[in-house]
Curated annotation (Swiss-Prot):
Recorded family membership: Belongs to the SMPX family.
UniProt disease annotation: Deafness, X-linked, 4: A non-syndromic form of sensorineural, progressive hearing loss with postlingual onset. In affected males, the auditory impairment affects initially high-frequency hearing. It later evolves to become severe to profound and affects all frequencies. Carrier females manifest moderate hearing impairment in the high frequencies. Myopathy, distal, 7, adult-onset, X-linked: An X-linked recessive, slowly progressive muscular disorder characterized by adult onset of distal muscle weakness predominantly, affecting the lower limbs. Some patients also have proximal muscle weakness. Histopathological and electron microscopic analysis of patient muscle biopsies reveals myopathic findings with rimmed vacuoles and the presence of sarcoplasmic inclusions, some with amyloid-like characteristics.
Role this protein plays: Plays a role in the regulatory network through which muscle cells coordinate their structural and functional states during growth, adaptation, and repair.
Origin species: Homo sapiens (Human)
CC terms in the record's Gene Ontology section: costamere; M band; muscle tendon junction; nucleus
Residue segments, region Disordered: 22-66
Protein name: Small muscular protein
GO biological process: striated muscle contraction
Keywords from the named record: Deafness, Non-syndromic deafness
Effect of residue 27 to A: In MPD7; uncertain significance
Tissues expressing this chain: Preferentially and abundantly expressed in heart and skeletal muscle.
Length: 88
């Protein structure tokens, strides 16, 4: 029961991580990428060979938002699960 003995300031610091946009947790859950909507003509006019050159990794998906370490997010989520609601 170590989590219940933490000071309230620690609980608040952990709760600050809740405000991360859902796009960081689940790709596609956040706002849709605007590049496809704003520039459909450019994507159609570009030949497929240059598209393959743009992708450094063959199977990599472009995700909306900044690149985030999944391991860090999973650690944060596991911390959030065990914060008792009584101390909020």
């Amino acid at each position: 029961m170590n989590m219940s003995k933490q000071p309230v300031s620690n609980v608040r610091a952990i709760q600050a991580n809740i405000n991360i946009p859902m796009g960081a947790f689940r790709p596609g859950a956040g706002q849709p990428p605007r590049r496809k909507e704003c520039t459909p003509e450019v994507e159609e006019g570009v030949p497929p060979t240059s598209d393959e050159e743009k992708k450094p990794i063959p199977g990599a998906k472009k995700l909306p938002g900044p690149a985030v370490n999944l391991s860090e997010i999973q650690n944060i989520k596991s911390e959030l699960k065990y914060v008792p609601k009584a101390e909020q």
